[in-house]
């Protein structure tokens, strides 16, 4: 396992740094904007990671820059990005003492990049709420605690969350004695009691091509696929008292070769947001479709139940996070400012007041956990 290594004590990017090793207040909006303005579409997180590592070293943290494997092929070649090909990638792991509580989130973002701007009381930009604003508030909370002499709080910031959580999986190889992991995602500052899992499948139907004037000579793969998709609507999907009933979306569908040809092939991708073990869902899927289509499993992530703390509002969420892949960092909690409903959109933003509230919430939550 990797170990956190002492940093070189480099210079913090930007102005306003106090003495190296001494905690000083963090301008959470300024830090968030500095992070947002560095493009870090998944696969190209190296620049923002290096900037953040230097920033934390300048504040006296020991920092590990943990290398990540490049993403393969065109997945990293995003139209409109200034990165023509996959670049270097790192996680940033930091501490000033022996962490018992760690703040964690991700600094990769979905495309397309757009820079920060402040409009009234809102901060806009890619990553404003998912999750660079969260990262800034976690750093500010850690510094607030450190100013009071509390050094048992660490920082685990990763890449790759938006495409398979490879950063979290790498970070989980680090030896840690941390007791609690506070992971940041947009929850409107409510503790996540649970998050749904994910189960994505590709359904492939095969038919027989024929002239459309003589459909009786062929077999339509599109008709087969439609029948199967309709059958999914009435299936008795698994339910859970906390998370509710499994639901799904049909995100992609394609098939056929020409309008005047009976389709020889068709396929669709179905994305289930799950509430428990996946085998019952798998059994229902195979029973309902009854060998009419080929089922290819593409993605499987578990539903997760998390630690909660009295006095904090809780909620359940339909998205998933890095939490399942960071089990070595302690009992998981999920909380962050902002709403998931504007994440991944061209209007992504966060209220500046929510960033300030998040600093206080994170500091209070960490102190409560440390006292326990």
Give the role of each language-model region.
Residues 23, 186, 191-193, 200-372:
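Metal-dependent amide/peptide-bond hydrolase catalytic core
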